[in-house]
Amino acid sequence: SFWPEEWYPDFEVTTCEDEISNPVFVPHTNNKNLWGVSICLNNQLKYVDENNQVQTSLARDSKDLYAHSMAQATRSYYENHTNKERGFILTRSNFAGTGKFVQHWLGDNYANWSQLRQSIVSSYEYSMFGFTQVGPDICGFFDQSDPELCMRWQQVGAFYTFSRNHNELSAPAQEPTQFEDQYVQVMKTAMRTRYE
């Protein structure tokens, strides 16, 4: 049993004064510390293991285990309530072994060439981590994608194991039909290649 009420941080722990919570190099955050944008990494997390025993772990050691537990519970529920057919369950957060239960979306990205390149690396990495289907938002989620970038991303996207074109509501539409014919034809060829 892996449900939210059984997994929670101990918010009364106030031991965030060590080198893990306050490293020498601090990335840019509004709060000027790592635990200000999340929970203290020294917090004790409590969870119920497969033998129904309450276990504890430090947040720094198993923070994403919560996401893994939710993926496992969702897969279990799905299989027990849908004639045991394997369904498509998409997650953004994960832990070692989560690919056994769900597929992975790489998260919100930007419409630029650097993010296109990074999506290839990330997709391969997550495949090595055991995810059978993984992919980014083709053409980028944030910012406006230009026709050349979107066309090239659609071509690369033909080879992602999880492929979708998706962007934020305030951004201009970036479906293949939104561009000039010269780009549409190339994108159409990419999609035909994917689904042949």
Q: How should these model regions be labeled?
A:
Residues 1-196:
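Catalytic-domain carbohydrate-binding cleft regions of carbohydrate-active enzymes
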